[in-house]
UniProtKB/Swiss-Prot annotation:
Catalytic activity as recorded in UniProt: (6R)-5,10-methylene-5,6,7,8-tetrahydrofolate + NADP(+) = (6R)-5,10-methenyltetrahydrofolate + NADPH; (6R)-5,10-methenyltetrahydrofolate + H2O = (6R)-10-formyltetrahydrofolate + H(+)
Pathway(s) per entry: One-carbon metabolism; tetrahydrofolate interconversion
Binding locations of NADP(+): 166-168, 232
Taxonomic source organism: Hamiltonella defensa subsp. Acyrthosiphon pisum (strain 5AT)
Protein name: Bifunctional protein FolD
The protein's role, per its UniProt record: Catalyzes the oxidation of 5,10-methylenetetrahydrofolate to 5,10-methenyltetrahydrofolate and then the hydrolysis of 5,10-methenyltetrahydrofolate to 10-formyltetrahydrofolate.
Signal peptide as annotated in the record: none
Record EC number: 1.5.1.5, 3.5.4.9
Example GO molecular function: methylenetetrahydrofolate dehydrogenase (NADP+) activity
Keywords for this protein: Amino-acid biosynthesis, Histidine biosynthesis, Hydrolase, Methionine biosynthesis, Multifunctional enzyme, NADP, One-carbon metabolism, Oxidoreductase, Purine biosynthesis
Length: 283
């Protein structure tokens, strides 16, 4: 068996085209383009690259993007003040605080300062709670991107045994809620999980988000499974790999996402979808 590749890059481009069409439709109606504000604290090079990529994507679809680079010395009060200012700005539809924040910040508390209807990352407790209650509003971008990717390939997860490896607030936990909503029998594996191999071998749909290169051996993959690899890990030789041992996994799975070019582009595409949605619901 040789797995079919789920090309997140091409699907993300489809979504960008759809969002751009939505923006043009608004402009023809005399309405303004969506506005996204991105807050970046400090000089983290990886975060700077992520922010630049997000702003580029925004410009490609016709959004108005605003970047607020703040020094490493920024206080909690200063960050809260900026978020409150953006909450009240009628031209801003989405507010994104680039993570990770410096260690002295309580990230969860900072994200709670964002108005739920402008929380285009989907991390606010209100939006997570809405997803849990089966009335999703603004959905976390990576899980939303994964669900969109499955849908675009006509892969219906309803009834599948799904395993999410990793229980972060950004991916693992909201991913489990998305899969429950889609009708999966969902298991979440984490650092205390015993007999991980058995769980993986039983999974019809496997989502891995732990940030460890080739953490899941390809030989564990259930024949015919759908494998979604969220990990992005740069090796010492400069090669970028996922959390799943790709080559072996691809001989057993029916479908698999590559790294890079799988989930990553879908996350950015979901951010664009959320921002357009937030704008349309406000104006």
């Amino acid at each position: 068996m040789s797995a079919k590749i789920m090309d997140g890059k091409s699907i993300a481009q489809q979504i960008k085209n759809e969002v751009a069409h939505g923006v043009q439709k608004r402009l023809k109606q005399g309405k303004r383009a969506p506005g996204l504000a991105v807050i970046l604290i400090g000089e983290n090079s990886a975060s700077q690259i992520y922010v630049a990529n997000k702003r580029k994507a925004c410009e490609e679809v016709g959004f108005v993007s605003h970047c607020y680079p703040l020094p490493e010395t920024t206080s909690k009060a200063e960050l809260v003040s900026l978020i409150k200012q953006l909450n009240q700005d009628p031209e801003i539809d989405g507010i994104l605080v680039q993570l990770p924040l410096p260690e002295r910040f309580d990230s969860a508390n900072m994200l709670e300062q964002i108005r739920p209807d402008k929380d285009v990352d989907g991390f606010h407790p209100y939006n997570i709670g809405s997803l849990c209650q089966r009335i999703p509003k603004l959905r976390p971008c990576t899980p939303l991107g994964i669900m969109t990717l499955l849908a675009r390939y006509d892969l219906d997860p309803c009834g599948l045994n799904a395993l999410v490896v990793g229980a972060s607030n950004i991916v693992g936990r909201p991913m489990s809620l998305e899969l429950l909503l889609a009708g999966c029998t969902t298991t979440v594996a984490h650092r205390f999980t015993q007999h991980l191999q058995q769980h993986v071998e039983n999974a019809d749909l496997l989502v891995v988000a732990v940030g460890k290169p080739s953490f899941i051996p390809g030989t564990w993959i259930k024949p015919g499974a759908i494998v979604i690899d969220v990990g992005i890990n740069r090796l010492q030789n400069g090669r970028v790999v996922g959390d799943v041992e790709f080559d072996m996994a691809a001989t057993r799975a029916a479908w698999i996402t590559p790294v890079p070019g799988g989930v990553g582009p879908m996350t950015v595409a979901s951010l664009l979808q959320n921002t357009l949605k937030a704008c349309m619901e406000r104006t």
